């Protein structure tokens, strides 16, 4: 058993599946096609109207009541009242006669047939378009004459569905802005460069308080002093690596480790003939280097002060770890004293 009132399709399908309005089929053919057209609103409307009624001959004079305030709710109830007895009238075989012509014209004015018909409706098209709710036309299957309604309600001319690519201005704005985090290369004066180099000779790794004091003294930013020390350490390590590789050492000897807590931090090419540095390493014992390392402070002390005791044979000959640590400490003290006297 079919329920046309419950399973009625949307209003967009009659425009595609609607038969030719001028074609009138006999009652036997209509009963033969009842299985295919029982769900069409157009068939229900055609059954309920008189046989001699033509669907496209709606008079324009009868279209004036919507302007006088005919409510849409009444037409909707009328459509439901007229749509429900349609199947019963088809099953009974006799068209209903309880409806008046006024109710039929009122229903047909707001029905699907009146809206989709291509008859003269220039006077009543604004009223019909305002009375029909937009939700009943959710499918895009419409005739060519119905496209202006779709454009006016769903696709207004003021708003474009697909935006133009040229309207996007945020990629161009992002290109024009400078990248964050990039600092310009600082240009240091001779006084600033000399002061930075002097501090670098004292300590390769400057502490944060000393760095802030030096930056405030030279009129620089803390980040500029930090970056300068990083670049200077990298340059120093590269030159130190070349020297160590030429003498058979490695670059890791300049880094503080457990076996080498006080690495050699002296610059390349700044030592005299008697001020040679000690190549510290776990497997590089050298009697001559240990002796020169222990005798480095003798060249830097004041001649008025009594000199230190001469190194013992055990100290000069043994390449053990304690002697290496003491030698490196004496080297650092000697460098600091030399810098103080020069300044």
UniProtKB/Swiss-Prot annotation:
InterPro entries: H2.0_Homeobox_NeuralPatt, HD, HD_metazoa, Homeobox_CS, Homeodomain-like_sf, HTH_motif. Residues 181-240 bind DNA. Residues 56-100, 240-343 are annotated as: Disordered. It is found in: Nucleus. It comes from the Eukaryota. GO terms for molecular function: DNA binding; DNA-binding transcription factor activity, RNA polymerase II-specific. Belongs to the H2.0 homeobox family. This is Homeobox protein DBX1. The gene is DBX1. GO terms for cellular component: chromatin; nucleus. Keywords: Developmental protein, DNA-binding, Homeobox, Nucleus. Residues 326-343 have a biased composition (Acidic residues). Pfam families: Homeodomain. Residues 314-323 have a biased composition (Low complexity). GO terms for biological process: cell differentiation in spinal cord; regulation of transcription by RNA polymerase II; ventral spinal cord interneuron specification. CDD domains: homeodomain. It comes from Homo sapiens. Its main location: nucleus. PANTHER family: DBX, HOMEOBOX PROTEIN DBX1. Gene3D superfamilies: Homeodomain-like. PROSITE patterns: HOMEOBOX_1, HOMEOBOX_2. The keyword DNA damage does not apply. Could have a role in patterning the central nervous system during embryogenesis. Has a key role in regulating the distinct phenotypic features that distinguish two major classes of ventral interneurons, V0 and V1 neurons. Regulates the transcription factor profile, neurotransmitter phenotype, intraspinal migratory path and axonal trajectory of V0 neurons, features that differentiate them from an adjacent set of V1 neurons.
């Amino acid at each position: 058993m079919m329920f046309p009132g419950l399973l009625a399709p949307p209003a967009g399908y009659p425009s595609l599946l609607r038969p030719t309005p001028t074609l009138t089929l006999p009652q036997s053919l209509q009963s033969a096609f009842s299985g295919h057209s029982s769900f069409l609103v157009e068939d229900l409307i055609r059954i309920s109207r008189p046989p001699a009624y033509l669907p496209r001959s709606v008079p324009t004079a009868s279209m004036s009541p919507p302007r006088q305030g005919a409510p849409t709710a009444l037409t909707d109830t009328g459509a439901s009242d007229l749509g429900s007895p349609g199947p019963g009238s088809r099953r009974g075989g006799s068209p209903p006669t309880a409806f008046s012509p006024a109710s039929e014209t009122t229903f047909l004015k707001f029905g699907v047939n009146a809206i989709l018909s291509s008859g003269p409706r220039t006077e009543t098209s604004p009223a019909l378009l305002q009375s029909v709710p937009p939700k009943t036309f959710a499918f895009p299957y419409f005739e060519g004459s119905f496209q202006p309604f779709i454009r006016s309600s769903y696709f207004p001319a003021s708003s474009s569905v697909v935006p133009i690519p040229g309207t996007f201005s945020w990629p161009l704005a992002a290109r024009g802005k400078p990248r964050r985090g990039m600092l310009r290369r600082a240009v240091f004066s001779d006084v600033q460069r000399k002061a930075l180099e002097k501090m670098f000779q004292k300590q390769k790794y400057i502490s944060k308080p000393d760095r802030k004091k030096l930056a405030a003294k030279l009129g620089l930013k803390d980040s500029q002093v930090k970056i300068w020390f990083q670049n200077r350490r990298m340059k120093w390590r590269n030159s130190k690596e070349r020297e160590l590789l030429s003498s058979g050492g490695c670059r890791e000897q300049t880094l503080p480790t457990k076996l080498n807590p006080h690495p050699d931090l002296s610059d390349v090419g700044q030592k005299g003939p008697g001020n040679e540095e000690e190549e510290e390493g776990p497997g590089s014992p050298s009697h001559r280097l240990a002796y020169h390392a222990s005798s480095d402070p003798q060249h830097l002390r004041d001649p008025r002060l009594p000199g230190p005791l001469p190194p013992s044979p055990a100290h000069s000959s043994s390449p053990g770890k304690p002697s290496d640590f003491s030698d490196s400490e004496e080297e650092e003290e000697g460098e600091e004293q030399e810098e103080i006297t020069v300044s």
